């Protein structure tokens, strides 16, 4: 099957869903990646990997490296420009007309003949405005698909043992699938290492929260989760991606989201 992962910045594909993406590719799915921006407003690395004006080009190459590591089938960009962080260091949304953004996502889904789409959650994970903007646009694209039949799943869905529940779980998106990606952590880590300009940021944030130095391997979550945002459902989702996960990836699925022990992550 063909699956489209659409996200705001280079590295979101690895941080939030990299293990699951690697699993899906390994089991025969064609996973396509579409990034809204080239991450022009991010950090340049410590020590600097490039000059600020080169960052978009460099991060595009980093993303291509990560997609290759994850076994991706294709990579494309929507061409929006990632703005610099604000004076307090908070991320900002890129400039986009919501309807046009949704149209671009729908075109990308059509181009790769996606049978399901995965994107940011309703809370923007940790409240990032660009993530929230992408979520709304992806939802609009899914709802406007022919017959409104393109399922949309969102990552970092909430469940009781979510290892980042207080920091990056989408608390209004209950998990329909919780995936133990520990066997795919070497692939996820390889993809994370592709994002050289952002490695210091990953480690710095996690270390500040932990109160001690945290290596990159321990920054990455070894459990990931998905919520079906559209069509809405109560109980067991039934669609092409749900069937693929159950039939091809069953051993990685937790029987119950509540069954995950936070200490395992």
Label for each model-derived stretch:
Residues 1-4, 89-265:
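Metal-dependent de-N-acetylase/amidase catalytic core
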Residues 1-112, 140-144, 244, 252, ...:
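Active-site rim/loop-helix segments in enzyme catalytic domains that contact anionic ligands
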């Amino acid at each position: 099957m063909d699956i489209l992962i659409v996200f705001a910045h280079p590295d979101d594909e690895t941080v939030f869903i990299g293990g699951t993406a690697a699993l899906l590719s390994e089991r025969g799915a064609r996973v396509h990646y579409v990034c809204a921006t080239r991450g022009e407003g991010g950090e340049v690395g410590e020590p600097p990997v490039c000059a600020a004006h080169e960052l978009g080009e460099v991060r595009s190459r980093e993303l291509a490296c990560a997609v290759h590591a994850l076994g991706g089938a294709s990579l494309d960009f929507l061409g929006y420009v990632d703005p610099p962080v604000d004076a307090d260091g908070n991320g900002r949304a890129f400039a986009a007309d919501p309807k046009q953004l949704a149209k671009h996502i729908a075109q990308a889904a059509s181009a790769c003949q996606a049978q399901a789409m995965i994107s940011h959650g309703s809370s923007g994970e940790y409240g990032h405005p660009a993530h929230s903007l992408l979520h709304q646009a992806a939802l609009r694209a899914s709802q406007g698909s022919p017959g409104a039949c393109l399922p949309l799943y969102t990552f970092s869905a909430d469940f009781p043992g979510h290892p980042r529940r207080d920091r990056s779980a989408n608390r209004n998106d209950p998990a329909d699938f919780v995936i133990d990606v520990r066997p795919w952590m070497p692939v996820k880590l390889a993809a994370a290492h592709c994002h050289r300009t952002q490695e210091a940021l990953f480690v710095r944030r996690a270390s500040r929260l932990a109160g001690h130095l945290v290596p990159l391997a321990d920054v990455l979550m070894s459990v990931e989760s998905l919520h079906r945002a559209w069509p809405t459902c109560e109980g067991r989702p039934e669609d092409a991606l749900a069937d693929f996960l159950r039939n091809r990836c069953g051993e990685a699925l937790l029987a119950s989201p509540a069954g995950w022990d936070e200490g395992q992550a």
